[in-house]
Amino acid sequence: YGINYYQHRLAVPINNQFIPYPNYAKPVAIRLHAQIPQCQALPNIDPPTVERRPRPRPSFIAIPPKKTQDKTVIPAINTVATVEPPVIPTAEPVVNTVVIAEASSEFITTSTPETTTVQITSTEI
């Protein structure tokens, strides 16, 4: 089992008069000998059905304090050192310069295109 970071809460409705809501204290007015009126003059407006309560923040979340911007921080820059761009190697095709004499002569003779002359005779009437 791990550490439970959440508060244990009972499954009891909030408006139960015997279990008070843990984050709020109800105002208590003690009048021992004074007469407490039973009927109050209520306004003609319907009261809200649900009392909105702010959610309590979990206690395990650490909220950092706000920092003041009074001090201006100037970063220290070293002006003596120069920044050189990185050298990027370029990929160039490598040409093999070793030439065999026999192979080059055969290549030259076989690579020359042959030109042939064809006579075209047209028979038009």
UniProtKB/Swiss-Prot annotation:
Positions where Phosphoserine occurs in the chain: 104, 122
Record localization: Secreted
Glycosylation sites: 97, 104, 121
Protein name: Kappa-casein
Keywords: Glycoprotein, Milk protein, Phosphoprotein, Secreted
UniProt similarity note: Belongs to the kappa-casein family.
Cleavage, annotated site positions: 59-60
Top-level taxonomic group: Eukaryota
PANTHER family: KAPPA CASEIN (PTHR11470), KAPPA-CASEIN (PTHR11470:SF2)
GO CC annotations on file: extracellular space
InterPro entries in alphabetical order: Casein_kappa
Origin species: Lama guanicoe
Region named Disordered: 42-63
Statement: the UniProt record of this protein carries the keyword Disulfide bond: no
Record function comment: Kappa-casein stabilizes micelle formation, preventing casein precipitation in milk.
